[in-house]
Amino acid sequence: MSTASTTHTQTDALQSDDLAAQCVDIARRAKAASRLLGTLDTNIKDQWLIESADALIEASDAIIAANQLDLENAPKYGLTDAGIDRLRLDEARIAGIATGLREIASLNDPIGEVLDGFARPGGMRIEKRRVPLGVVFFIYESRPNVTADAAGICVKSGNAVILRGGKEAAHSSRAIIEVLHEVGRRVGIPDDAVQLVGTTDRAAVGHFLKQSDNIDVTIPRGGENLIRRVAAEATMPVIKHYDGNCHVYVDESADIEMAVDIIENAKCQRMGVCNACESLLIHQSIAADALPAIAKRLASRGVEMRVDERASAYVPDGVPATDADFAAEFLGPQISIAVVDSLAAATDHINHYGSGHTDAIVTSNIAASEQFTALVDSSAVMVNASTRFNDGGMFGLGAEIGISTDKFHARGPCGLRELTSYKYIVRGNGHIRG
């Protein structure tokens, strides 16, 4: 059966009356495929990644044509400018996807790594060995590049993946999966290892979330409402973050030029992503000197500044901020700004309004940086660096499957190791317990 017919058959089946049974079937097939992937030789996984990267480049025209269909439908789905930006694919972005797959291939395979090993007094030997989680159910919205990223990182870490993309990127994701399946057949990775759910019916998500016998973890990546629904309904563990209300705090000892550059990058380099800066805090003793320069730079980039009463003295074009503004993930050309009395006031503000994603301090005082990193309760805390660096690629982890603000199992960028668990291998010589 051709890749296209496989995809379309799955789509038709999932749109039949027996949706629940079809979801169970997909999950069971993924579970079976995961047993193969867990023992697959690293060379085969890397071959699939490298050949898939090359094949995606070769298929650029077809993928861009499919993406154009999604872009034409974007107004019907009410996508914002930020959403359309996340949806758009061109040759450069496809090349970036291919580069990401090659980078994953270059990373060490975590599966089989011995984390610990020791011998008991009676001669019994015990190993703690890294193993895949099994099956990942990955839910995402209008980012077709994530289709390849998620497939790549799951296969390299020995996991099967069920991909449920948003309707906004349906054509793009299908075109990418067709390429990955064709390569998989050549190298020995079954279609069931990487399955794209062929319906946008929201009921399908609910059916998959009940499949704890076959699905080992769910990772939702999208809007807060989606993630809260998944967290409430899932019967298996969930790796997630709700939003990205990221802060930059300018300390009293900050280099002003550095602060201006970091804030511009954190806010403006790419506004529609979860690690973009949404809130600026500045120490009262440096506000008069630093805030006008920062405001001038942000204004030149078209950013609307929503300011508290104290900040308004230095930002005459600012809009009065509401309490909701300080908790907002704007994903666009807006930023909230507040003047604070101290570093402690800044960390209190961040821990109250923030989302535990990424927060930064600009300072020349080592003690201040240590205090900030100790007090801010986020997955990544930056010192004199943009919030935009909280990213699997920037951390050298390869393409990430998401960023977690949870504290159990995974926190921060979720790379290969975050998609693994471990088991104990015990070797005896006829040992019995007395």
UniProtKB/Swiss-Prot annotation:
Q: Does the keyword Iron apply?
A: no
Molecular-function annotations in GO: glutamate-5-semialdehyde dehydrogenase activity; NADP binding
Biological process per Gene Ontology, one example term: L-proline biosynthetic process
Quote the subcellular location field of this record.
Answer: Cytoplasm
Say what the protein does.
Answer: Catalyzes the NADPH-dependent reduction of L-glutamate 5-phosphate into L-glutamate 5-semialdehyde and phosphate. The product spontaneously undergoes cyclization to form 1-pyrroline-5-carboxylate.
| Listed name of the protein | Gamma-glutamyl phosphate reductase
- The kind of enzyme this is, by top-level EC class, is oxidoreductase
**What does the record give as the reaction this protein catalyses?**
L-glutamate 5-semialdehyde + phosphate + NADP(+) = L-glutamyl 5-phosphate + NADPH + H(+)
Give the EC number(s) under which this enzyme is classified.
1.2.1.41
